[in-house]
Regions:
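Bacterial N-terminal signal peptides that target proteins for export
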Residues: 4-23
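C-terminal motif of bacterial Sec signal peptides marking the signal peptidase cleavage site
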Residues: 32-35
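Bacterial signal peptide processing site
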Residues: 37-40
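Short amphipathic, basic-aromatic surface patches that mediate peripheral association
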Residues: 51-62, 78
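Short coil-to-beta strand junction motifs in C2/discoidin
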Residues: 63-70
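Tryptophan-paired
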Residues: 89-134, 148
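Short, surface-exposed ligand- or partner-binding patches at beta-edge/loop junctions that are enriched
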Residues: 133-150, 154
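Glycine-rich, aromatic-bearing surface loops/beta-hairpins
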Residues: 147-181
Length: 181
């Protein structure tokens, strides 16, 4: 092999190596910018809902004084059973165990309970697994166990839950009503 041919051969080797490195680099850049999860996998995060329960000065008023009340918050897949249920089922599992278990298994994703006094604020955190939050529309529901149950389902509230990684929901509880702030 002559000296001239060796230089050409070495030049071609360098050129083909350069093309290979350039091709690998280009593929890496394309994968990184295309949102491909192979390189930059984004961790799936659970949703966190911080619930602030706020009691008014007339909370659970019995005619003489305001009284403490138990308040429950739920993240639900469906609110129909919640809206039609007797409140005693939601607060006392032994009242109708079969209905309570059915509600818990079919509708409840997560829940929290607070014992609220007049002019008091309680907070609770509800964590919603990413797998549930990502695949379905969820609803937020709250109910209070009043001394005198109100008419017209004013003791409960339901609304669509936003799909935000972290959010705060304020639930106001009055004499005989529950409302989202």
């Amino acid at each position: 092999m002559s000296s001239h041919n060796r230089d050409v051969y070495d030049g071609r080797t360098f050129h083909s190596r350069y093309q290979w490195v350039l091709a690998v680099g280009l593929v890496a850049v394309l994968l990184a910018t295309s949102g491909c999860g192979w390189i930059f996998h984004k961790a799936q995060k659970d949703l966190t809902v911080v619930v602030k329960f706020v009691g008014t000065d007339s909370l659970n008023f019995d005619g003489e004084r305001a009284q403490a009340v138990e308040v429950k918050a739920f993240v639900l897949t469906d609110s129909h059973r919640f809206m039609s249920a007797d409140p005693r089922i939601l607060f006392d599992p032994s009242f109708e165990p079969t209905l309570y278990e059915d509600f818990q298994k079919k509708d409840v994703v997560s829940s929290a309970t607070a014992h609220l006094s007049p002019l008091e604020t309680e907070s609770a955190e509800i964590v919603i697994p990413y797998a549930k939050a990502d695949k379905m529309d969820l609803e937020f529901a709250a109910i209070a166990n009043f001394f005198h149950p109100p008419s017209g389902k004013r003791e409960r509230v339901v609304f669509k839950l936003r799909k935000k990684p972290k959010q705060t929901i304020t639930i106001n509880v009055g004499k005989d009503w529950v409302a989202q702030d």
